[in-house]
Amino acid sequence: VSRGLGDVYKRQFLASYQFLKGLEKGTMDITREHLPNKSSITEIKIENFYLKEMPVLTQILSVASFTGALDILEGKGVFFKEAFLKYELVNDELRILECYGTGPSLGFVLEGKIRKDDFVSLNGSLAPANTINNIVREIPVVGKILTGKKGDGIFGASFKIKGKDNLKVEVNPIKTLTPRFIQRFLKILKK
């Protein structure tokens, strides 16, 4: 197991994936476990960072009509308290096992893969912070204390990112969040 991989590796990792462009500040911890057959499992935890001027996220936010988050992204950036990525590398194909991010403005979950030929195929869900508050609010006793007064229903956007050089983004802007998405966020928030 390789723990605390160095800054050079971290910069190379961020530079090698087009959809990660725009990550600023924060701290990153990377752990890699080498497995047989030239495969590995890597865990990346990033804390207290901003996403800024990220074309794929800009497109998702604008189609999903998350205008407040879009304004922040185009300004100082969208702040995330924590993001976690666990992936398996098998035959030079990156398979996402778990990926999420939480912050005061947005939360997301992501799954998919990046093939050996650099073709990206990702699916995810994006929720504004008030949606996350509504999820937390449903936790018996503690939820209402933590989130204050009740807001509107639980809605978010789902998206797909596909392609090689020019990533194509599809967004379903009015998607009721699935129980799986809600369960993942409750699990994340309980950590």
Feature names for model-found ranges:
Residues 2, 28-29:
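Short alpha-helical segments and helix-capping/turn motifs at coil-helix boundaries
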Residues 50-52, 132:
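Gram-negative outer-membrane beta-barrel proteins
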Residues 17-23, 29-38, 42, 59-60, ...:
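Extended terminal
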Residues 47:
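Short edge-strand/loop segments of extracellular domains
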Residues 1-5, 9:
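Single conserved hydrophobic/aromatic residue that forms the stacking wall/gate
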Residues 8, 58-61:
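Short secondary-structure boundary/capping segments
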